[in-house]
């Protein structure tokens, strides 16, 4: 599923008029905190809504947002939802500046913005996603330790033979600074250790990584699970643990993030309605998993802004 800017499809004039998704008393933004998915029921309700919702941010879950937006606009033809996935940092900066109504992020806003910016935003945790290393089809390595990943992504390990593979130079495809996927990966691999290694390329989006990994031999990168594509590259184990959702729910697989959608406390009604929909059963009950993500309700652990993991 390649990343692309999502443009509004106008469904005005649908015969019979579709039921609105907006509930009475929208509280997704503007209150002390966002409602949890468990608090949200069916999306069907009585009031209509109109307006324009715009977003930017993480490319890792852009496809989930796009799929939800399609359903939301089907039922709310007077609402336009559009946006793109230019990275968590850009999305958070944009929503804080008011140039978009929603900022999508793989990381907590506290890690990218100043405190006075964060206090004006409301966080909606819409999903959890695993992220893991991927290697080219010709690479004969199917498991790496965190220490080996640290060596590769710091430039200390440069040949596949050093980690059990063939004698070939490792091509490191990194993500650009500001990427939430990169921040999540580096936090899991390096902890608090500072790292400034660009690799052989720094790519903008998850879709760019998919494309480059599919056409480059001896390469390594990292992607969220929803962008894994075994026709182009191989997802590998970390510390002997398979990169799959079941191993993320209890933190057996260590590289994962919560997907956040931030809005301003004084967000407009259309934005509130769409974010309420993201937390509704219509999205959380089925769509999240269909798109390769994990419902927040399925997690046995939680991770805070500092990266500390604790049991629910």
Name each model feature, range by range.
Residues 1-6, 14-27:
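N-terminal secretory signal peptides
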Residues 2-6, 30-97, 101-114, 121-312:
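Exported/periplasmic ABC-transporter solute-binding proteins
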């Amino acid at each position: 599923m390649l990343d692309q800017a999502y443009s509004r499809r106008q469904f005005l004039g649908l015969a019979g008029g579709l039921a609105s998704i907006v509930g009475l008393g929208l509280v997704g933004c503007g209150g002390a905190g966002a409602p949890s998915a468990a608090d949200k029921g069916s999306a069907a309700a009585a009031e209509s809504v109109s307006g324009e919702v715009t977003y930017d941010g993480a490319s890792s879950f852009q496809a989930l947002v796009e799929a939800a937006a399609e359903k939301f606009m089907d039922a709310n033809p007077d609402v336009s939802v559009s946006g793109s996935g230019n990275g968590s940092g850009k999305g958070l900066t944009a929503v804080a500046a008011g140039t978009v109504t929603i900022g999508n992020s793989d990381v907590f806003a506290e890690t990218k913005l100043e405190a006075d910016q964060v206090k004006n935003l409301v966080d909606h945790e819409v999903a959890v996603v695993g992220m893991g290393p991927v290697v080219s089809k010709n690479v004969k390595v199917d498991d790496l330790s965190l220490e080996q990943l640290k060596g590769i992504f710091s430039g200390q390990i440069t040949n596949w033979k050093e980690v059990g593979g063939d004698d070939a130079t490792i091509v490191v495809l990194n993500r650009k600074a500001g990427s939430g996927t990169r921040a999540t990966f580096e936090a899991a691999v390096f902890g608090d250790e500072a790292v400034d290694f660009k690799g052989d390329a720094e790519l903008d989006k998850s879709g760019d990584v998919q494309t480059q990994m599919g056409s480059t031999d001896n390469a390594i990168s990292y992607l969220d699970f929803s962008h894994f594509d075994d026709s182009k590259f191989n997802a590998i184990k970390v510390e002997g643990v398979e990169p799959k959702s079941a191993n993320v729910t209890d933190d057996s697989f260590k590289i994962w993030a919560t997907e956040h959608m931030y809005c301003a406390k004084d967000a407009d009604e259309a934005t509130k309605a769409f974010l309420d929909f993201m937390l509704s059963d219509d999205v959380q009950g089925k769509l999240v998993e269909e798109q390769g993500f994990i419902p927040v309700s399925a997690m046995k652990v939680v991770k805070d802004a500092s990266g500390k993991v604790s049991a629910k």
